[in-house]
Amino acid sequence: MSGLWFTEDHEWIRIEDDEGAVVGITDYAQDQLGELVFVELPEVGAELGQGDEGAVIESVKAAGELKIPVSGTVTEVNDALADEPGQVNADPLGDGWFFRVRVRDTSELEGLMDEEAYQSYIESLD
């Protein structure tokens, strides 16, 4: 189940190896939010369940949260976002990642969308 997966709330998770994954928000989400001005990340070691709040996001337009797409333990956070939250706007699928997790249950990925399904989903929103 490697690859890039998406939620209907516009979060993404990229599975990197057997247990490790990176989490962030999509280009669609950052575009809807506008310029990000603040990101609060979880603590390394935090145990999060699927759908739990993983991060707090504030932009010039709104405040919201990133919900974790699958259950897991936070293993690393992108500390650069504290000083440069705009990295999320500039590169949401790259340097704008939020945190890494050790995935607890890969079967939870089955409820997520692949890139093609997500693209169709966001096209249906416009």
Please provide the spans of the model-predicted regions.
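Short, charged/polar surface micro-motifs in flexible loops or helix N-caps
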Residues: 30-31, 44, 71-74, 79-82
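Residue-level recognition of beta-strand microenvironments
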Residues: 13-15, 60, 71, 77-80, ...
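Short, glycine/small-residue-enriched coil/turn segments at secondary-structure junctions
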Residues: 1-3, 66, 70
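Short, solvent-exposed beta-edge and connector elements
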Residues: 32-38, 60, 68-71
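Acidic, low-complexity mobile loops and tails
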Residues: 1-50, 86, 90-126
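Short, Lys/Arg- and Gly-enriched loop/turn segments at beta-strand edges
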Residues: 58-67, 84-86
